[in-house]
């Protein structure tokens, strides 16, 4: 008998307690759950810090079930320090859960849930890194010690602490890079430093077209941009991110994208410049603690990595009620604008905060 089968011994009994039929064995079954550590929480990204088997429930942030899932597979993954040893494998869907195995190599991956036609119905970011620490800033907001997607919080600017890029309001990350791409075109580094699952017929690409949220979910690797080079949405929607965590918030469980008010303490950020007045690094200190901000740049309206030497971070806030614009923090040289304007189609880093709401 399998571990998921149960035997029920049943007999019919009359009102006076007499048996009216013989007892019978009735065998039933209950579908076994997937093995592995349950990552818990409802989120669009999950932190994994040790090798092993893991699983999570296929729900949105609000707890609602995601329908039409038939299977799951990995979509893309970073190559890590050893490209012959994939960072994630054995992705499987069963009974409202997705399971996978992590090799222990740090990096990032996206897992996609698929319908019967192999179309993506939802996807999740798997962030393989040591457990991020937190730090309280001057205004009382508690921040993560690294950019979303970074595998290091150490001082310096290198690909381990750079993090991933996000178009405002989208839950899925875009791989970064290590140098400007205005000559090579968008995603030149992403194409060499990530492995893409050939079974899912996806690739890193830029598309000059405004779309709706449903299309962005189906094509998480497509960097869309509308006709005005401002928003990736055909019709703007300022509610996709908020100071209450939404279904499209990309931060892990227990964290969310900060509002413009919550991130204002960073105006005290400091910088070290090189001989060309480009920032070598930025840092913020409060109450004898210091955290670092790599000068990584951003992705522009063509999806290209530009402005290396600056820090560009999204907030969840709309920018002064301007359509299709949101507030982003811009650190460039000794200049810091905590109310910088950013078209929602551009790609910027995120520094998640502890979600106390």
Task: Specify the residue positions occupied by each region the protein language model found.
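Extracellular/luminal regions of secreted and cell-surface proteins that mediate adhesion/ECM remodeling
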Residues: 5, 21-22
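Extracellular recognition modules
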Residues: 7-13, 110-112
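Short, solvent-exposed loop/turn segments at the edges of extracellular beta-sandwich modules
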Residues: 13-18, 116-117
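Short, isolated positions in well-ordered beta-strands
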Residues: 20, 143, 291-293
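Short, compositionally biased
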Residues: 25-245, 319, 344-346, 350-357
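C-terminal, surface-exposed recognition/capping segments
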Residues: 148-150, 222-357
């Amino acid at each position: 008998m399998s571990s998921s089968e149960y035997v029920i011994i049943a007999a019919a009994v009359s009102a006076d307690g007499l048996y009216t039929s013989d007892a019978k064995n009735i065998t039933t079954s209950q579908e076994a759950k997937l093995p592995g550590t349950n990552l818990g929480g409802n989120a669009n990204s999950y932190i994994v810090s040790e090798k092993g088997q893991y699983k999570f429930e296929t729900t949105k942030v609000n707890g609602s079930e995601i329908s039409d899932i038939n299977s799951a597979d990995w979509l893309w993954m970073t190559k890590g320090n050893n490209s012959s040893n994939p960072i994630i494998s054995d992705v499987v869907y069963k009974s409202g859960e997705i399971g996978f195995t992590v090799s222990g190599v740090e990096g990032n991956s996206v897992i996609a849930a698929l319908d019967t036609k192999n179309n993506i119905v939802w996807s999740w970011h798997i962030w393989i890194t040591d457990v991020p620490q937190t730090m309280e800033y001057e205004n009382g907001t508690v921040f993560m010690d690294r950019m979303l997607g970074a595998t290091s919080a150490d001082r310096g600017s290198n690909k381990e602490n750079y993090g991933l890029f996000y178009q405002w309001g989208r839950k899925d990350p875009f791989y970064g890079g290590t140098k400007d791409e205005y000559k090579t075109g968008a995603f030149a580094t992403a194409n060499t430093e990530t492995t893409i699952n050939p079974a899912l017929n996806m690739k890193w690409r830029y598309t000059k077209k405004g779309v709706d949220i449903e299309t962005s979910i189906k094509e998480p690797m497509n960097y869309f941009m509308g006709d005005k080079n401002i928003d990736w949405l055909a019709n703007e929607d300022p509610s996709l991110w908020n100071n209450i965590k939404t279904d499209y918030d990309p931060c892990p469980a227990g964290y969310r994208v900060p509002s413009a008010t919550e991130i204002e303490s960073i105006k005290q950020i400091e910088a070290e410049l090189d001989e060309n007045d480009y920032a070598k690094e930025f840092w913020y200190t409060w109450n004898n603690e210091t955290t670092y901000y790599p000068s990584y740049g951003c992705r522009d309206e063509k999806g290209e990595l530009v402005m290396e030497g600056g820090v560009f971070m999204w907030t969840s806030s709309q920018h002064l009620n301007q359509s299709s614009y949101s507030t982003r923090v811009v650190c460039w040289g000794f200049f810091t604008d905590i109310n910088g304007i950013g078209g929602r189609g551009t790609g910027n880093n995120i520094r998640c905060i502890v979600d106390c709401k």
